[in-house]
Design a protein with these regions (language model features):
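A conserved acidic beta->alpha catalytic loop
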Residues: 39-48, 65-67, 90, 96
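Short aromatic/hydrophobic "clamp" motif used to bind/position activated sugar donors
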Residues: 86
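Conserved donor NDP-sugar-binding/catalytic core segment of glycosyltransferases
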Residues: 94, 98-128
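Conserved nucleotide-sugar donor-binding catalytic segment
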Residues: 136-220
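N-proximal low-complexity "stem/linker" segments adjacent to membrane-targeting elements
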Residues: 1-24
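Glycine-rich, basic loop-to-helix element that forms the pyrophosphate-binding segment
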Residues: 63-81
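Short, acidic, metal-binding catalytic loop of nucleotide-sugar glycosyltransferases
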Residues: 23-32
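Short, flexible, basic/aromatic active-site loop/helix in glycosyltransferases
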Residues: 117, 124-147
Length: 297
């Protein structure tokens, strides 16, 4: 019998993080899934690391050449998917245990694409800067939604097509895919739960030269061992604002929090987003260089 969900994990030469991302899938309360770990022409020990996990639901696939972005690994995952629902997980990201159950529930209630709130962790000299994204319910065309936070019906990509190559686009491939799905009148539903954690490589200089996993290890341990991890993280992020705005009405506080979350995140990644006049795909190439990867030929 085919699984309900196909989880696609695109990866490239960063094997140390895979036990943590894959482990967060294996700890899901919803267990009817397969996991396709798709290497983008990996040349390191990623295959051996995946096989050592030893779960029959996990399949290793490696593309013959490096394509430079998650689009083609995701497309290969879509081609080999057996599930009626598709979930994506960045190889250096983590899911909370209720991620699939929350989003699959929304799909079973009629959504075509569901997404939860993701905690972005940007490392700074004095610790983490935390942002939740998205901070509002309604999808708007062009809105950024991290693939790690998305589950959609396989019929969506069957109809609108898969992931486009970044050099064909003036925007990012994930933003392009969500916009095409929305334009085709598929129903988007926001699930107001914190369901995933993202460690954006585009905000970590030379991370692909260092290939660390200490952040994923520490946060994975917290997720597993801290009771009430989700509300605790919400409180940790909101409390500094409470001290500053304790005299303000709740609605004002919430509005300010949403605005700060969006503004703060965008300020830190704006230098990685290409202006319209730049060549197609140039922002992805800039991200690659910042992360410690060479520009693609």
């Amino acid at each position: 019998m085919d699984p309900s969900v196909t989880v696609i994990i695109p990866t490239y030469n960063w094997s140390s993080v895979l036990p943590y991302s894959i482990g967060s899938v294996l700890r899901q309360t919803f267990t009817d899934f397969e996991v396709l770990v798709v290497g983008d022409g990996c040349t390191d020990d990623s295959e051996a690391v995946v096989r050592r996990i030893g779960d029959p639901r996990i399949k290793w696939i490696n593309l013959p050449i490096n394509t430079g972005h998650q689009s083609e690994p995701n497309n290969e995952g879509l081609r080999q998917a057996r599930g009626q629902f598709i979930a994506y997980l960045g190889h250096d990201d983590l899911w909370l245990p209720h991620h699939l159950s929350c989003l699959i529930s929304a799909l079973k209630q009629g959504a075509d694409l569901a997404y939860g709130t993701i905690l972005f962790l940007l490392a700074g000299p004095n610790g983490y800067h935390r942002w939740f994204w998205p901070t509002y319910e309604r999808y708007q065309p062009g809105m950024s939604i991290a693939p790690t936070s998305v589950v959609h019906r396989r019929s969506v990509t069957d109809q609108v097509g898969g992931w486009r190559h970044y050099r064909e686009l003036d925007t990012h491939p994930d933003t392009d895919l969500w916009r095409r799905a929305y334009t085709a009148n598929y129903r988007f539903v926001f699930v107001p739960r914190l369901t995933a954690i993202k460690f954006p490589a585009a905000a970590r200089h030379d991370v692909y030269k260092i290939r660390p996993c200490h952040e994923q290890a520490a946060w994975s341990e917290r997720i597993q061992n801290e009771d009430g991890f989700e509300p605790a993280e919400l409180i940790r992020t909101v409390l500094p604002m409470v001290a500053e705005y304790e005299a303000k009405p709740y609605k004002t506080l919430l509005h300010d929090f949403m605005q700060r979350t969006r503004k703060g995140l965008m300020q830190r990644i704006r230098h990685l987003i290409s202006p319209p006049a730049r060549p197609k795909g140039d922002s992805i190439e800039a991200r690659r260089e910042f992360k410690g990867l060479p520009r693609m030929p």
